[in-house]
């Protein structure tokens, strides 16, 4: 997969960099592994906006992904690497030796014709899924379970990977892409490798319309709003509401720009060995 730049025949093309889709081997999805995807426009079951700036976008179908990898001991052959419009990573179509087909999130080095398997006896090779206790230290992993048998929940976006650091009794120690080091139950499954499509974050959409095709609406700055609409709204000129200096906040009043907002007595805190590092301030 690579990034394609355009000759600046128009002002938009001057700033556009998109996927060249050279890693895609099949254009049409496996229809039996898809289902209708009804857009909610960011609304919940009450009809109230809970996710701002969502709406519109091209019609899509949801690809049913096997996050559990619970078909253990049966080898599968990679039939195709496909594009998924609802996620940043590529997906791989597997055909198992018993002729069942499933989609998985494709790792970076997986090719058509590769053989993969899941289970406690699977070798720690790219694309194979096995318990954390059986994965050697130092290997990159993704699609990590938090609860055994629930399916992968961590590290699923394009280009991401965690790193297995070792074992501590019944827990595995994993370093996440954010830099956080935490304990995960050693019985949880993970897939060996790095998620495909690492150049996703080098794309430049070039124009607002392409963002709308993806289902994103315009994002208005809080300081440009009225006080009734945002804690940072109002004021004279470009100042924040209330006159002088004011802490930057989210629309719901939570402090932004560095202040910790995590609940102090959250149950999962005991599994975190080292918090993710703070972002360095730009000079």
Curated annotation (Swiss-Prot):
Region (Disordered): 34-53, 224-283
UniProt entry tagged with the keyword Thylakoid: no
Alphabetically ordered keywords of this record: Ribonucleoprotein, Ribosomal protein, RNA-binding, rRNA-binding
UniProt cross-references to HAMAP family, sorted A to Z: Ribosomal_uL2_B
GO biological process: cytoplasmic translation
Biased composition (Gly residues): 232-245
Family listed: Belongs to the universal ribosomal protein uL2 family.
Function: One of the primary rRNA binding proteins. Required for association of the 30S and 50S subunits to form the 70S ribosome, for tRNA binding and peptide bond formation. It has been suggested to have peptidyltransferase activity; this is somewhat controversial. Makes several contacts with the 16S rRNA in the 70S ribosome.
Classification via Gene3D superfamilies: 2.30.30.30, Nucleic acid-binding proteins, Ribosomal protein L2, domain 3
Top-level lineage group: Bacteria
Protein name per its UniProtKB record: Large ribosomal subunit protein uL2
């Amino acid at each position: 997969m690579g990034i394609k730049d355009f000759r600046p025949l128009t002002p938009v093309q001057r700033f556009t960099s998109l996927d060249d889709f050279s890693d895609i081997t099949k254009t049409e999805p496996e229809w039996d592994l898809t289902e209708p995807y009804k857009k909610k426009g960011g609304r919940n079951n009450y009809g109230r906006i809970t996710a701002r700036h969502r709406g519109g976008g091209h019609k899509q179908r949801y690809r049913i992904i096997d996050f559990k990898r619970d078909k253990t001991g049966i080898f599968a052959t990679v039939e195709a690497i496909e594009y998924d419009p609802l996620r940043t990573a590529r997906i791989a179509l597997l055909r198992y030796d018993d002729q069942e087909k499933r989609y998985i999130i494709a790792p970076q080095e997986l090719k058509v014709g590769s053989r993969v398997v899941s289970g406690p006896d699977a070798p720690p090779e790219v694309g194979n899924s096995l318990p954390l206790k059986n994965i050697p230290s130092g290997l990159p992993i993704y699609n990590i379970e938090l609860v055994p048998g629930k399916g992968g929940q961590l590290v699923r976006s394009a280009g991401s990977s965690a790193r297995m650091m070792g074992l501590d009794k019944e827990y595995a120690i994993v370093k996440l892409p954010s830099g956080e080091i935490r304990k995960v139950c050693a019985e949880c499954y993970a897939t060996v490798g790095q998620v495909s499509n690492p150049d996703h974050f080098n794309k430049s959409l070039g124009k607002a319309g392409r963002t709308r095709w993806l289902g994103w609406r315009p994002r208005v700055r809080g300081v440009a709003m009225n006080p009734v609409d945002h804690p940072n709204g109002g004021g004279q000129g470009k100042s924040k509401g209330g006159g002088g200096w004011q802490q930057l906040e989210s629309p719901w009043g939570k402090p932004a720009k560095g202040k910790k907002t995590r609940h102090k007595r959250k149950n999962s805190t005991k599994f975190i060995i080292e918090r993710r590092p703070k972002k360095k301030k730009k000079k």
